[in-house]
Amino acid sequence: MRQGKVVWSYDDPAGKGEVSDAVMLSNGNVLFAHQFGVTEITPDKKVVWNYDTPTGHEVHTAMPIGRDRVLYIQNGDPAVLRVVNIVTNATEHEITLQTKYPDSAHGQFRHARLTDRGTLMVAHMDSNKVVEYDYDGKELWSFPADVPWGVTPLPNGNVLITDREGVREVTRRGDIPWSFRPSDTPAYPFTSLQQAWRLPSGNTVINNWINEWTKTPENEPGSVQAIEVTPAKQVVWVLQAWNPPASLGPATTLQFLAGPAAEDVHFGPVY
């Protein structure tokens, strides 16, 4: 989207699963996790790399590390975190992640993100917590959450956690300097909060997903795809684009393209 217009879009021809994560790289390529696989495509929609999950497994979150590596979490029994070289297709690093319900892949993970320190924040949906791991899989920090969906590390070292209750900014000590609940903006109903992002202004953008199988914008009047609020929770901007020419559909994830290159991150020694 640029200036309120859709300038590029992609419909997965396979269409096998829900898209839960998508990242645009600085070269215009897009890496996305689509439940039963991970794919990177060019701006002209050619597949650069693709991975299909084995039966009984799912992938809902993936991120680039440099131009040649991808980190993703594969739900299943066992659930694993992998770093793959997409040039050689070799798995260069793998860690087993503990889950509460190993035989229920769908509800294990939806989102993870790398920190500036080269660690990984993981939202454990089925274990009701957010955990920070180092490169070797050692747990460095954790915080309880109610079926956490999104986790966003902040430059100040704090973490934005999005769960069933709302959004909380959590410090390393476990303090909560800021929080948001759907009741804070009653004019804009939320059905399922997904993720949150802190803007340079200090405002926070929160996105909302409509379950297209059982609910629609028509029977959820006022539903938004995203909302921007100030630290005082005043509404700055609302995204409600359900109809042509900019029919965006349910919003699982957002990316602000003016920020740093998505691939300029590291996981331990891997850049």
Q: Model segments located where?
A:
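Histidine-/acidic-rich catalytic cores in large beta-rich domains
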Residues: 1-271
